Amino acid sequence: MHATTVKNKITQRDNYKEIMSVIVVVLLLTLTLIAIFSAIDQLGISEMGRMARDLTHFIINSLLD
């Protein structure tokens, strides 16, 4: 009986850790998206177009090397 109780508590703790990990990941992704959209808003459309073009050239050149 005691072993079952200990096993259940370990399982509950593992589930808690998984849930907390998911929450942390979701919060970090949310903050990252907020930062990205804030930067896009501050830079404006013309700057983003130039950055996207430069990034595209960089990716293509990296793939060709």
From Swiss-Prot:
<feature type="topological domain" description="Periplasmic">
    <location>
        <begin position="40"/>
        <end position="65"/>
    </location>
</feature>
<protein>
    <recommendedName>
        <fullName>Two-component-system connector protein SafA</fullName>
    </recommendedName>
</protein>
<dbReference type="InterPro" id="IPR031411">
    <property type="entry name" value="SafA"/>
</dbReference>
<comment type="function">
    <text>Connects the signal transduction between the two-component systems EvgS/EvgA and PhoQ/PhoP, by directly interacting with PhoQ and thus activating the PhoQ/PhoP system, in response to acid stress conditions.</text>
</comment>
<keyword id="KW-0812">Transmembrane</keyword>
<keyword id="KW-0472">Membrane</keyword>
<keyword id="KW-0735">Signal-anchor</keyword>
<keyword id="KW-1133">Transmembrane helix</keyword>
<keyword id="KW-0997">Cell inner membrane</keyword>
<dbReference type="GO" id="GO:0005886">
    <property type="term" value="C:plasma membrane"/>
</dbReference>
<feature type="transmembrane region" description="Helical; Signal-anchor for type II membrane protein">
    <location>
        <begin position="19"/>
        <end position="39"/>
    </location>
</feature>
<comment type="similarity">
    <text>Belongs to the SafA family.</text>
</comment>
<feature type="topological domain" description="Cytoplasmic">
    <location>
        <begin position="1"/>
        <end position="18"/>
    </location>
</feature>
<keyword id="KW-0346">Stress response</keyword>
<dbReference type="Pfam" id="PF17073">
    <property type="entry name" value="SafA"/>
</dbReference>
<comment type="subunit">
    <text>Interacts with PhoQ.</text>
</comment>
<keyword id="KW-1003">Cell membrane</keyword>
